[in-house]
A protein has these predicted regions:
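Bacterial N-terminal signal peptides
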Residues: 6-16
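Short intrinsically disordered, low-complexity coil segments enriched in acidic
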Residues: 2, 16-19
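Positively charged n-region of N-terminal signal peptides that target proteins for export
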Residues: 1-4, 157
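Mature catalytic domains of secreted/periplasmic carbohydrate-active enzymes
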Residues: 21-448
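Residue-level detector of intrinsically disordered terminal segments
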Residues: 4-5, 33
Length: 448
């Protein structure tokens, strides 16, 4: 690791001194199969439904029994306050690692490899082939982090002064990094064929360091829309990319039995602004409801929630983290565009009730990214610096030292990263620093 960043880390450390059933406290829940959907209509031809007239759906999804009900009111009333260990922990490592690193194209490789003219698209052509023939599913199959050694990495991070780890559970690519009950596209069945989250958990517990799991799959249903495109010019013009494949198309192929819809989702490009947003640098579609896909939307929200509950069941994390830009996932606007439901409240209530059962107290927290701070949730500040000191709440700032996923020769200067660390800690925040791992699971030499 770069010696200057390591020194900064040490200083901060010193400052700190379906597929099966879910069992929830005696309640069995069987997630049904993905609902069928109509044939896609013409692109950009369907207006989004109104979020003003669409009432938030209360999901029929059981949670672990306990004092926490799946409402913000109950969560805020029962939560005992942010644990002191977060207040005392000013530096942590953000482990933003997964198969997208295999593209060596930085963040969002899985989406950008389907956008003509992007570096990710060109890199994919060179290293794998055309996305109509060799898509992201083949990246998953071939990804082999053979040098991934979580024990050695955790020791490095702890020596650098990290007090807890932020570990990516699933990114927007929908690939679960654990032995997932509900997602067959996972790291125990494809690629490394290892329970990567389980390995991180064991290493963290052995080192006596806390950890949390992050989940970025809520808005994957519109994020993945580039996989339903095709080239607009050249020899492959009009040939659909592999997001258009079906379960039946896999017969006799290596991915037989794996449904591409559980990876890429369904084609939603008929809704206004969805295709445009998919090809933008960042912008989500306009606020609204995917009103022609309400049965699928409800199923999708349950699938999202159950995968998080599954990871909590298996690994007993010290916090959970959901990505997004609005006040909660599935809000109907921002990254939560498409549906409105109480999936987030159910996940948090289940997490806190489970923790109470296991530990006898709730010494954990939930990050709902960019949610206005409320009792029961913690918010974050990605790469920004608040104007004022924020002593009224525990909060976390996060920044990568290069791109979020590995990209060669993309590194911020040491003094810029250290300056960021100091600015955040001076404002009473904690800092999560992402140091991207190489595709093989090793640290780049410049970070050692």
């Amino acid at each position: 690791m770069n010696q200057f960043i390591m020194l900064g880390c040490l200083w901060l450390g010193a400052c700190a001194t379906a597929f099966s059933q879910q069992q929830t406290n005696g309640v069995n829940y069987q997630l049904g199969p993905m609902p069928s959907v109509h044939k896609p209509l013409a692109e950009n031809s369907v207006p989004m439904g109104s979020i003003q007239t669409f009432e938030e759906v209360k999901l029929d999804l059981p949670i672990t029994s306990g004092p926490y009900e799946p409402t913000w009111k109950s969560i805020e009333a029962n939560y005992p306050g942010t644990p002191e260990w977060l207040r005392d922990s000013k530096f942590e490592i953000w482990i933003h690692f997964g198969p997208q690193s295999a593209g060596e194209s930085g963040d969002w490789y899985a989406r950008k490899m389907y956008v003509e003219g992007t570096p990710a698209y060109e890199n994919h052509l060179k290293n794998y082939g055309h996305p109509s023939e060799v898509g992201y599913k083949e990246v998953l199959r071939d990804w082999n982090p053979k040098k991934f050694n979580p024990k050695a990495l955790v020791d490095i991070y702890k020596d650098a002064g990290a007090r807890f780890l932020i570990i990516q559970g699933v990114h927007h690519d929908q690939f679960d990094m654990w032995d997932s009950k509900y997602q067959p596209w996972n790291s125990t069945r494809l690629g490394p064929k290892r329970d990567l989250i389980g390995e991180w958990e064991k290493a963290a517990r052995k080192a006596g360091i806390r950890f949390g799991l992050t989940f970025h799959h809520e808005y994957s249903w519109w994020w993945w829309q580039t996989a339903f495109q095709s080239d607009t010019k050249g020899d492959k013009k009009g040939v659909p990319y592999d997001g258009n494949l079906t379960l039946a198309d896999g017969k006799g192929k290596w991915w037989e039995g794996l449904d591409p819809k559980y990876l890429y989702g369904i084609n939603l490009r008929e809704y206004e602004t969805v295709a445009e947003a998919a090809n933008s640098r960042w912008s989500p579609p306009q606020a609204g409801i995917f009103s022609g896909h309400l049965e699928y939307a409800e199923w999708y929200a349950k699938w999202w929630a159950l995968r998080m509950m599954d990871a909590v069941d298996k690994y007993n994390p010290d916090f959970i983290y959901t990505d997004g830009t609005d006040q909660q996932p599935f809000s109907g606007s921002g990254t939560g565009t498409g549906y409105k439901c109480d999936a987030m409240q159910r996940v948090i209530a289940d997490f806190y009730n489970k923790t109470m059962d296991r530990r006898g107290k709730v010494d954990v927290f939930s990050i709902v990214k960019f949610r206005k701070q409320t009792n029961g949730t913690v918010n974050t500040c990605e790469t920004g610096i608040p104007e004022n000191i924020k002593t009224d709440q525990a909060w976390i700032a996060e920044t990568p030292v290069g791109d979020w996923f590995y990209g060669p020769n993309f590194v911020y200067s040491s003094d810029a990263v250290i300056r960021y660390l100091l600015e955040i800690v001076a404002r009473d925040g904690a800092v999560g620093v992402s140091i991207p791992l190489r595709p093989d699971g090793s640290l780049d030499e410049c970070w050692r």
